[in-house]
Amino acid sequence: MKVLRKTIFLSLAAFLLLSELGCGDQYRPVANPIVGPGGQPQSVHFAYVLNYNPNGNGSTTTIDVSGDSVSWLQPMGVGPVYEALLSLNGLFVANSGNDTVSDFPAYSNGAVTTVGLLSGSHPVFLTSTKNGNLYVLNSGFTPDMCPSSGSVSNIVTATGAVSNTACVGLNPVNMVQAASGGQIFVLNAGDNMGQGSVSVLNPVTLELVKTLNPGDGLGLNPVYATSSVDGSYIFVVTQGDGVHPGALDILTQGSAPVVAASVPLGVGPTYSYLDTHLNRLYVTNAGDNTVSVFDASNVNVANSPPIPSLSAPVAVGTTPTGVAALKDGTRFYVANSGSNDVSVVSATSFAVLKTVAVGVGPNFVATEPGSTKVYVTNPRGFSTSIIQTANDTVSTTIAAPPQVPGCTAACALQQPTMVVTQ
């Protein structure tokens, strides 16, 4: 059950959602635009909402930021759980249910291409900071390649071909590539009798550089990882085990990566987000309803603490699972899945300025580059809420597409799991 718990807690919340599919009566939200004060002019931007379908292929909804309207709907594979936007190569989606990755142009209603993976791969995560490459994290066993562990595959984005696949640990749940094409760090939930490990891979060859275990100073139950802006450090969120508390481990990359330092977190940390504008790291602590905020510009593993906290943990709503900051540096937004709302927090005073009611079970939040809109996916509410930042109110609620294409009445809806913007 420990491994299952970690998988469900994996933010991005694809796996949080999977535990809730098919539960209860389905609420069917309707788009309800609210006219904002004076309008909010902006450049052309889009938000891409990933929808899970328990009864067929999933989809991606593309929303025009300027009009809060659906521009197009693209079909994905079976069981889509994660999406990644590569500026030069479009949007990629990991389809765990049929061992594929979908790709389509991000700026137009273009054709969807499909990259096939090895049978049994069950892709769950995507990452890349290296032009021309997309790394796919596969949680399943592949009899012809990795019959007793997970794996990482490298897709050459120009051709859509898988160039290499390498074995990692058991039940990998998350990974990150260090900035500027650095090493790849894979979090394996099933290793060491469920205590976890981190596999460090060469990004060119996918050869294993080192495996970091609890005996090397790694905290128990690693669940999420984020790279520093310059790639010097990898920040790994570990949940602990009920006896050992959660912690933020700071890892180095290179020929001999190590767990260089660690700082305590709140109870039940699940997710981290790097605000590249202010160079801050945010960690959601779902167990005690707080967010930890760190100064990621001032990391020194020889100091105590090795990464300074900018405030006491910020008390937010119930069960925070997602966080994102405005590019203008004024506020950050926290999705609280247990209280069905979003906390709006000042980036200077760290005071909660407002609590915004959204749909049921909000799990993921993203801001668009113009800092005018915030997008919140509500998987149990079958909707996406759009918050207008001029007054921090919900301007529009967009219903998810029907599970059965073409359905027009009393339709069961798909379930939005995450959103990315450009």
Where are these regions (language model features)?
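C-terminal motif of bacterial Sec signal peptides marking the signal peptidase cleavage site
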Residues: 18-22
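Predominantly soluble domains enriched in secretory-pathway, periplasmic, or organellar proteins
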Residues: 23-422
